[in-house]
Amino acid sequence: MGMKIVGRERRKLRIRKKVEGTPERPRLSVFRSSKHIYAQVIDDVSGKTLAHASTLSKDLKGSLDEDNKVEAAKKVGALIARICKERQIDKVVFDRNGYLYHGRVSALAQAAREAGLDF
């Protein structure tokens, strides 16, 4: 395992000790791969995913520009916020999953905030 991945796993564990999703305020978790970005809203008490969205979602499939991953992350953030609003989820706890709050991760978070999620 490379040192970047080891460092991210350490940051992830350090963050997860402090961040926990509840039924009233579930956790918005972000996963980033080299091509795609995924977001899911998780209730850690019951261990269930309440909502999910990614660049592979059917709602976004045709509207994404493959060259601009930051714009794709913004669309995923707006989509996850819209899905949460439909399911009466207004407040979440943001889990950046060990990634730096920069680039695609911050773009997703800002778009979700602008679309009405509170965190």
UniProtKB/Swiss-Prot annotation:
Keywords: Ribonucleoprotein, Ribosomal protein, RNA-binding, rRNA-binding. GO terms for cellular component: cytosolic large ribosomal subunit. It holds the Pfam family Ribosomal_L18p. One of its GO terms (biological process) is translation. Transmembrane segments: none annotated. InterPro entries: Ribosomal_uL18_bac-type (IPR004389), Ribosomal_uL18_bac/euk (IPR005484). GO terms for molecular function: 5S rRNA binding; structural constituent of ribosome. Belongs to the universal ribosomal protein uL18 family. This is one of the proteins that bind and probably mediate the attachment of the 5S RNA into the large ribosomal subunit, where it forms part of the central protuberance. Part of the 50S ribosomal subunit; part of the 5S rRNA/L5/L18/L25 subcomplex. Contacts the 5S and 23S rRNAs. This is Large ribosomal subunit protein uL18.
